[in-house]
Amino acid sequence: MAFGTTAAGTITKEQTLLSIRRLPVAASTNIAKGNVLEQDAGGDLIVSPVGRTAEVNHYVALEAVDNSSGADGALHVPVAVAGHFVTVVADGAIRPGTAVVISGSTAGQVIAYVASSHAKNQVVGIYWGKEGGIVAKAAGSPYLESFTDAADFSPADAADGDVIEVQLVD
């Protein structure tokens, strides 16, 4: 059984020269921790849509914020910015070292960049690895369990639904 304890929306490597930002949330927007975000035309954050907006800065929500019934800018959300190593949710298979773009089917999640399908100016970051380990349970009595730790975000292939570490580049 695969095991991971780090939630999406967690900064995994402290960057002393980078700081998080608190940006306003657009009206009628519900943001989950770990969603990839971008600014709308008014400068308020929205969950990055499946349409993949080109040439925009991307952020990752570090907290959940529900502005479903609020006005533009009524609430703010702390976000990771370009340069941060942060966790997000994969929406498909991704190999380590691969650039990632917004998923075409799930807003706020990422998939592998494919040159024939995506523009370079849609890249959000680079996938480096995922946390986890293996829990093994003995087949017979006394049913001992062991855990092999891989908590340092080892460079393993990601699958749909995995919480993965990306370095934001845009």
What are these regions (language model features)?
Residues 2-170:
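Glycine-anchored, exposed beta-strand/edge motif detector
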